[in-house]
Regions:
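Cys/His-clustered metal-coordination modules, chiefly Zn-binding fingers
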Residues: 105-171
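Short secondary-structure junctions
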Residues: 24-36, 79-82, 135-140
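Short edge beta-strands and adjacent turn/loop segments
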Residues: 31-56
Length: 171
């Protein structure tokens, strides 16, 4: 038996681990931490006092998954938690709805349009997503390519300001 601890309810070593993980950047989106991204699913302590950190990959085959595990292990080791156990959590699968509001604001400030609609939006079944230009705020945007600088992004152009930008796809 163990307790799952969310960042806002954490105390003691769990709180320190959440703080350490909040400093680990996503390798493909270094403006975001892995906590901002929502891939840290839990920090829990078992009955023996051993700490467990659950990580969910953004999608199967994400090339950053192993790099993230290495960075998390390094952060935990440097923080004095070398015996913490890393766990891969595949269910439920990660969704872009787990991006924090801070993550969405950081993406926009960095020039990447965050997803705006729920993943299971009925409109998304038949139409392209609504994408707001992160530079000028216009909705007059068009997809240039389904794939941007990384597989989780698409490349768009704003018809109003004529600037190209990446859009973080709903996953």
């Amino acid at each position: 038996m163990s307790a799952v601890i969310a960042p806002e309810a954490a105390g003691g070593p769990e709180q320190l681990i959440w703080a350490l993980l909040a400093e680990v950047p996503d390798p493909e989106l270094p403006v975001l931490s892995i906590v901002d991204l929502g891939i840290v699913r839990h920090v829990r302590q078992d009955l023996d006092g051993r700490l467990h950190v659950g990580l969910t990959p953004t999608y199967s085959g994400c090339p950053a998954t192993e790099v993230i595990r290495i960075a998390v292990r390094a952060a935990l080791d440097a923080g004095g938690y070398a015996d913490a156990v890393l766990e891969e959590v595949l269910s439920p699968p990660w969704t872009s709805e787990w991006l924090t509001s801070a993550a969405r604001a950081k993406l926009t400030a960095f020039g990447i349009a965050p997803p705006e609609e729920p993943v299971l939006s009925p409109r998304r079944l038949w139409q392209a997503p609504l994408v707001t230009c992160p530079r000028c705020g216009s909705r007059a945007t068009e997809r240039v390519s389904e794939f941007g600088s990384t597989p989780c992004k698409a490349h768009y152009r704003c018809s109003a300001c004529q600037e190209p930008f990446d859009y973080f796809k709903c996953l």
